[in-house]
Amino acid sequence: MLKLTKRADYGLIALKHLAESETGAASAKEIGDKYQLPPEALAKILQRLTKQGLLVSQQGTHGGYSLAKKATQISALEVIRAIDGDVFLTSCSSVAKGCDQHEICTIREPLRKVNNSIRGLLSRIKISDMRDAAGDEADPMETAITRAESHAVQDVRELVTLGEERV
């Protein structure tokens, strides 16, 4: 099953929260308390996002974290990569010969296309999409994905065509 790690979930939640914040900043404690996230894990994630240039950290009594760029300029893919490294559906997507079946594999190319499509979709989902979808009655992530997909109809058509060719 393809799914995000809890660390990536927490990072996306934190960035969405910062994008929604009236002041544009929040402490790790404020974010952790609001979403019931483990404080130690969240602190490490926020430090990593700061080190990767997605957040800015302010010290002091009124310190906290804020977005280093506009919410429209930060993608879900950037956040996930900053926390967990690159996104791969299969091990052979990341290493040329990372599989015993490398020489005879018949699904490497279709899976590479699926992997690239997933990366493409994640790169089109912006923190602003997640923020703006928060008030929708539908699932906010579904709404963000729908918005991103509207910009990616061609990718979906290519996948459908690939599937039809294989049948």
Model-derived features: where do they sit?
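C-terminal regulatory/oligomerization modules of transcriptional regulators
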Residues: 96-167
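Beta-hairpin "wing" of winged helix-turn-helix
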Residues: 53-67
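Conserved segment of winged-helix/HTH DNA-binding domains
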Residues: 71-96, 107, 111-117
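Residue cluster at the C-terminal edge of the helix-turn-helix DNA-binding motif
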Residues: 51-54, 82
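Key DNA-contact positions within bacterial/archaeal DNA-binding proteins
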Residues: 40
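Alpha-helical residues within the helix-turn-helix
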Residues: 33, 50-51
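N-terminal helix-turn-helix DNA-binding core of bacterial DNA-binding proteins
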Residues: 2, 6, 10-37, 56
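Residues within the DNA-recognition helix of helix-turn-helix
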Residues: 45
